[in-house]
Amino acid sequence: MQKAKINRLALFPILLLGGMAGLMQGGCSTEECYDNRNALPYAGFYGVMEGKMEQISVDSIRVYGIGAPGDSILSEGNRSIANLYLPFRIDSDTTQYVFKLINKLYEPYNIADTLTFIYSREARFVSAACGASYVYTIKDIKTTGLLIDSVAVPGGRITNADVENIHIYFNTGEDPDYSEDDE
């Protein structure tokens, strides 16, 4: 019986192409979840400054969740912030946060505001690799009104779009200028 001779140089391009195809296939499944698949509420802070509504930075404000498992402090209050991620609970239709002034001037007065989001949540299948994500439809937003004047969710839904989807309007002690003349 005669053995067939295999030309190893002829097999090299075939093996190389097969290996590259395998690497590319594995790369597709890992890159599938790089995009933002979860609805993560992103809040921007606003206030009236010199008669105009504009984005503001808030100094010395601690933000933490109520009833959240583990460490729920989202801002220690040790730096000025103009926006913040406020994750919603997926095991409940309500999420609450406390916004508390902690600077030396206001701390003795214990000035804090509780912000409550009431929503419905809808799980959406993304893929086998990524699992599911949630979309939140806002039903109501409540605040105790000490620091926060009002809150808006433009569109009423929080999806996985990478945008500021919550506007928190702080009391700044100024009233907005509603005049149409900018003279």
Go through each PLM region and give its residues:
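Short N-terminal leader segment in a subset of presequences, especially plant chloroplast
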Residues: 8-13, 38, 139-143
